[in-house]
A protein has these predicted regions:
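Short, compact, well-ordered microdomains
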Residues: 57-88
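N-terminal non-globular leader segments, chiefly Sec-dependent signal peptides
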Residues: 1-67
Length: 88
């Protein structure tokens, strides 16, 4: 299972307002999802700063997996999502 553990901008600055919004108004933050949602698919769910909504995004630019940390790093057009793989 996967858990979103952080969101930053492309310079690595934590997006506090984004995280706060997602934590308080959308069920995606801190919830668990199967890997299929993120890996091997051309989209993920991202917070859009302009509309203030979670959107299904097709703008993944790059993703990587850090095996020792069991951490997926997903880069979109304007954010980087850190998604931790947890034992079920």
């Amino acid at each position: 299972m996967l858990k979103i553990v952080g969101v930053t901008d492309l310079d690595g600055v934590v997006k506090e307002e984004t995280i706060k919004y997602i934590e308080t108004t959308h069920s995606l933050y801190g919830k668990f999802y199967s890997k299929d949602l993120f890996v091997g698919m051309p989209f993920c769910f991202v917070y859009d700063d302009y509309s203030g909504q979670m959107l299904r995004s097709s703008t993944i630019c790059h993703w990587d997996y850090v095996e020792k940390d069991k951490l997926y790093i997903i880069e979109t057009m304007n954010s980087i999502y850190y998604i931790k793989e947890l034992e079920e």
